[in-house]
Amino acid sequence: MNILKLILRLFLKLFFKTKLTYHQQILLNEPSIIIPNHTSFLDAVFVFAYLPNDVCFVINTRIAKKLELPLKLINYVTIDPLSPYSLKKLINLVKSGQSVVIFPEGRISRTGMLMKVYNGIGLIALKTNATLVPIIFTGLKYSKLSRVTDKFKAHFFPQVSMYIGDSFKLDP
C-alpha cells in the first residue's frame, strides 16, 4: 500500500469514523468491475483509499478536465458517455485484465437514493466475463460535498459506512 492511501485511510477513519464492512476480501485477481453507488463527490476518494492499487477509475471526459491535478495521483481512463466507442474501449480494457471502477448511475444522486443504473456495465460484464463487485455507501449523502444538501442537514464529516458486497458474475 502506498503512503498516500495510508494517510488517506487514517484521515477518513479519524474524521468520518469510517466503518468498512465486507463479506469477502476483494482480491481482484481476475478482471473486475467495481460498481459503487454515487451520493457524493467523496465516493471516489473512499474507493481509492480502500481498494487495491491496481484499479482504474472510469471518468467522464468533461469531468476529467476539471480534475486534472488529483487525477495525476490515480490510474484512470476517460470516456465520452455519448460515444458508443467508449463501451468498446472499456470492454478492451477489462479484457486486457484491468479492473475498473464505474459509477453505474453515471452521476451523483440528487435524492440520496439509488438513481437509474445504466445498462453499459451489464454489457461490459457479459462481453468480458468480469466479476461485478458492488459497493454501497451510507452517510455520504449527508456530507457538504453531496448534491442533496437541501433535503438533509449537511455535515462536514458525517459518519460513513462502506459495505463491499459479495462479488458475482452475470449469466449469459
Predicted regions and their residues:
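Short, basic, glycine/proline-bearing loop/turn elements
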Residues: I7-L8, K72-T78, P104-R107
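Hydrophobic/aromatic ligand-binding patch that stacks against planar heteroaromatic rings
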Residues: F46-V47, P70, N92, L123-K127
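Catalytic core of membrane glycerolipid acyltransferases/transacylases, capturing the structured
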Residues: L28-S83
